[in-house]
Amino acid sequence: MSAIQASWPSGTECIAKYNFHGTAEQDLPFCKGDVLTIVAVTKDPNWYKAKNKVGREGIIPANYVQKREGVKAGTKLSLMPWFHGKITREQAERLLYPPETGLFLVRESTNYPGDYTLCVSCEGKVEHYRIMYHASKLSIDEEVYFENLMQLVEHYTTDADGLCTRLIKPKVMEGTVAAQDEFYRSGWALNMKELKLLQTIGKGEFGDVMLGDYRGNKVAVKCIKNDATAQAFLAEASVMTQLRHSNLVQLLGVIVEEKGGLYIVTEYMAKGSLVDYLRSRGRSVLGGDCLLKFSLDVCEAMEYLEGNNFVHRDLAARNVLVSEDNVAKVSDFGLTKEASSTQDTGKLPVKWTAPEALREKKFSTKSDVWSFGILLWEIYSFGRVPYPRIPLKDVVPRVEKGYKMDAPDGCPPAVYDVMKNCWHLDAATRPTFLQLREQLEHIRTHELHL
């Protein structure tokens, strides 16, 4: 560690670059890939006191570990940094200048819409190979077929197989970063050889969620095979690298396969989604203490997002998971963005989304607060669908006229007051998550929830 590097503060996460067996009793041995947490700086800047995942503490060498960083906001990650989209043949040739044998890019075909073109620099000139798209497969020679562009590029990187040269160096599209490189650089890349996929625990339109084993620990793995979908999920994974809180589902790492698969590995939440947990147990099992604790768990996660200028945009009981020891954690960061950005409202869940977000695409912490009020209603109704007996098309017009749902059966009046505060039509008059947490803690302290 050089003298100019600032020391890492307590709580910094590091990932081991090499094995360290330790030579003295106070050393903390570790294996390559282990995640360690800095406890304190020592007198010697080349060594830190750290602890491992089971809480054992000891001294570690700074040059054997790499600090884990969040992927920088605004970084445009790409699984296909060599893909340049709609550019012409002439533009491709300019991009591959000066000539360098094996330099390549892929573009959309101008002559054959729906097909692609592989452009390769070879001995001073550029060759253009049509990539035909037929029956959901891609091929250059109609002999070898590929599922996606990444598989095709990987194949011709290892073997020219009829091309003028094998593919050696990608011409990266300006402004993009290869996802694999960025996750590796920031300390979030995991090793596929150490991941065992055990069984499917959920299916989504994007792919499967599987129970896995990573280095002896149970993990949940989102497996995304389709390259376009995987590209969208990169945004979710990069948001998760920036967030750390005991009530947010924790990202453990990312695996990007050269063939196009993307695996997002997170902590395993044994008891599934909060909505299913509530529905399957009900009033006879879950008392007022338990419901208020879940409400506070979610509120603390949202207060953390609020403080870090992130808006979740899809807060609902289906997107909250429950751990083995009954801790509720917010998940599903697919729509989470920095507070300033806007988004298409095509797929938003109407019953959970604030009126101004549906009407004007205005998302803010205050629109998350509205959703939190709906989530509280879900908790206290034991997982009922909001706005019962109101047709979906009538929900927004009624809400915009000031309609608020009645309190769920048995809901304490103090908790119902909190819900109603979240549902002010004027976003500015809704409370912050900090204020909501204080209100819920007041309810707990004064036993107003029983």
UniProtKB/Swiss-Prot annotation:
State the PROSITE patterns in the record: PROTEIN_KINASE_ATP (PS00107), PROTEIN_KINASE_DOM (PS50011), PROTEIN_KINASE_TYR (PS00109), SH2 (PS50001), SH3 (PS50002)
- Region feature Interaction with PTPN22, mapped onto this chain: 9-70
One MF term in the entry's GO annotations: metal ion binding
Q: Please report the stretch or stretches of sequence annotated as the Protein kinase domain.
A: 195-445
Q: Which SMART domains match?
A: SH2, SH3, TyrKc
Q: Domain SH2 spans what residues?
A: 82-171
- One GO biological process term: negative regulation of T cell receptor signaling pathway
Record: active site: D314 (proton acceptor)
Cofactor(s) demanded: Mn(2+); Mg(2+)
Cite the post-translational modification comment.
Phosphorylated at Ser-364 by PKA, leading to increased activity. Autophosphorylated.
Q: In which tissues is it expressed?
A: Enriched in lymphoid tissues.
Q: Which residues form the SH3 domain?
A: 9-70
Q: Can you cite an annotated GO cellular component? A: cytoplasm
State the UniProt keywords alphabetically.
Acetylation, Adaptive immunity, ATP-binding, Cell membrane, Cytoplasm, Immunity, Kinase, Magnesium, Manganese, Membrane, Metal-binding, Nucleotide-binding, Phosphoprotein, SH2 domain, SH3 domain, Transferase, Tyrosine-protein kinase
Gene3D superfamilies, per the entry? Phosphorylase Kinase, domain 1 (3.30.200.20), SH2 domain (3.30.505.10), SH3 Domains (2.30.30.40), Transferase(Phosphotransferase) domain 1 (1.10.510.10)
**Reaction equation(s) it catalyzes:** L-tyrosyl-[protein] + ATP = O-phospho-L-tyrosyl-[protein] + ADP + H(+)
Tell me the domain comment. Answer: The architecture of this protein is similar to that of Src-family kinases (SFKs) with one N-terminal SH3 domain, one SH2 domain, and a C-terminal kinase domain.
Instruction: Quote the subunit structure annotation.
Output: Homodimer (via SH3-domain). Interacts with PTPN22. Interacts with phosphorylated SIT1, PAG1, LIME1 and TGFB1I1; these interactions serve to recruit CSK to the membrane where it can phosphorylate and inhibit Src-family kinases. Interacts with SRCIN1. Interacts with RHOH. Interacts (via SH2 domain) with SCIMP; this interaction is dependent on phosphorylation of SCIMP 'Tyr-96'. Interacts (via SH2 domain) with PRAG1 (when phosphorylated at 'Tyr-391'); this interaction prevents translocation of CSK from the cytoplasm to the membrane leading to increased activity of CSK. Interacts with LRRK1.
Q: According to its UniProt record, which protein family does this protein belong to?
A: Belongs to the protein kinase superfamily. Tyr protein kinase family. CSK subfamily.
Q: What is known about what this protein does?
A: Non-receptor tyrosine-protein kinase that plays an important role in the regulation of cell growth, differentiation, migration and immune response. Phosphorylates tyrosine residues located in the C-terminal tails of Src-family kinases (SFKs) including LCK, SRC, HCK, FYN, LYN, CSK or YES1. Upon tail phosphorylation, Src-family members engage in intramolecular interactions between the phosphotyrosine tail and the SH2 domain that result in an inactive conformation.
This chain's protein is named: Tyrosine-protein kinase CSK
